[in-house]
Design a protein with these regions (language model features):
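Acidic (Asp/Glu)-rich catalytic clusters
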Residues: 1-2, 35-39, 68-76, 98-108, ...
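N-terminal beta1-alpha1-beta2 module of alpha/beta enzyme domains
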Residues: 1-74, 197-198, 204, 209-211, ...
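Hydrophobic faces of well-ordered beta-strands that scaffold small-molecule active sites
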Residues: 3-11, 45-47, 78-84, 107-114, ...
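Flexible, glycine-rich active-site loops centered on histidine and acidic residues
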Residues: 5, 10-23, 91-172, 247-251, ...
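Active-site mouth loops of central-metabolism enzymes
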Residues: 8-28, 83-92, 115, 128-130, ...
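Alpha-helix-loop-beta-strand connector modules within alpha/beta enzyme cores
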Residues: 57-81, 141, 222, 266-280
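Extended, intrinsically disordered, low-complexity segments
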Residues: 132-143, 148, 152, 275-317
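Substrate-recognition/cap regions that form aromatic- and gly/pro-loop-enriched pockets
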Residues: 229-275, 279
Length: 317
């Protein structure tokens, strides 16, 4: 029996069709695109996915987190999934940058964890911090490190008690003490997300992720819930019918060119929603809208407190 799928969209070139003009005036391009996606009821926009594919990434582009930061301001409901890799970016930088964008978007940001970033490679074929090969296992280490850092400073510790003068209950801030793949003491210098953890997408091998992205037609294995990517515009209708009947498929990810985006959003998406193949746009954080529970791990309850010897019970206002 078919079930309603969540809807993600990747726009080739992130919607930048005239690279010289659009990179010089990105605000118009991003605002326009975000508005169109929201009106169409798209659940989330994946920004920068092509960076993970050799031969697909263009020579001129804006950083996905920069686009997402602007899109957060220009949108109210649309989820923003940022593509990034533990390649030239250290997990600490990834964790801080992603959580900062999520704060700007009030809990609407996710992460597509890439193995390799062709947009920032600059001839680097390994992790520029550790020298590790850029494999799926390496990405799993980066995902674990980022998740751990997100949990070192829980958002709930920010109490903002004016009467007592306590800003943060610092006894809840934990060390990361990451030793596998990376050596990171932590904690992160930004509080965690209202989502708990940001949702994470990974290609095929979903170790450590909330959702696995597979290509339409590829075999579906067990493990994390699956999002199926459809690249051919002419087969979207048939693909949605088929994907909605895959037991582990929870969503579809449409990669479209700017030239056909209008037709897909104005004709294909409403028709599929009318047939019950796509769900109605939800409310709340991105994690809540996608029905994703917060992972149980990593558990930092046994990690050392950062401020064990602090003289006061919390950061002062």
């Amino acid at each position: 029996m078919a079930k309603p799928l969540s809807l993600g969209v990747e726009v080739v070139g992130d919607g930048i069709t005239d690279r010289k003009r659009d990179v010089e005036d990105p605000s118009r391009v991003i605002t326009d695109l975000v508005h169109r996606l929201e009106v169409a009821g798209v659940d989330y926009w994946v920004i920068g996915a092509e960076r993970g594919e050799a031969g697909q990434f263009g020579k001129v582009a804006l950083d996905p987190s920069l686009i997402a930061t602007f899109a957060a301001r220009a949108s109210r409901r649309l989820g923003l999934v940022v593509a990034a890799a533990g390649h030239r970016d250290h997990p600490y930088n990834l964790a801080r940058r992603l959580i900062s964008v999520d704060h700007a978007a009030r809990g609407r940001v996710g992460w597509l964890a890439l193995d390799f970033d062709h947009g920032t490679a600059l001839n680097a074929v390994s992790d520029t911090w550790t020298g590790a090969d850029l494999t799926a296992d390496h990405t799993a280490d980066a995902v674990t490190a980022v998740r751990t850092l997100w949990r070192t400073w829980p958002l709930e510790s920010v109490v903002g008690d004016v009467d007592s003068g306590v800003f943060v209950d610092v006894t809840r801030i934990r060390r990361a003490d990451i030793a596998h793949g990376y050596a990171i003491a932590g904690p992160l210098n930004v509080p965690g997300s209202v989502q708990g953890d940001l949702p994470i997408w990974r290609h095929a091998d979903a170790l450590g992720a909330d959702l696995a992205v597979i290509e339409d037609g590829d075999p579906v294995t067990g493990g994390a819930p699956v999002v199926v990517r459809v690249r051919a515009a002419e087969v979207i209708d048939a693909a949605l019918e088929r994907i909605a009947r895959i037991p582990s498929a929870t969503g579809v990810l449409l990669r479209v060119t700017p030239g056909i985006l209008e037709r897909v959003l104005d004709l294909v998406v409403p028709a599929a929603r009318a047939r019950g193949l796509l769900g109605e746009p939800g409310t709340g954080t991105l994690r809540e809208r996608l029905g994703l529970p917060v992972p149980a791990t990593p558990d930092l309850s046994a990690h050392r407190a950062v401020f064990e010897s602090v003289a006061t019970p919390g950061g002062r206002l």
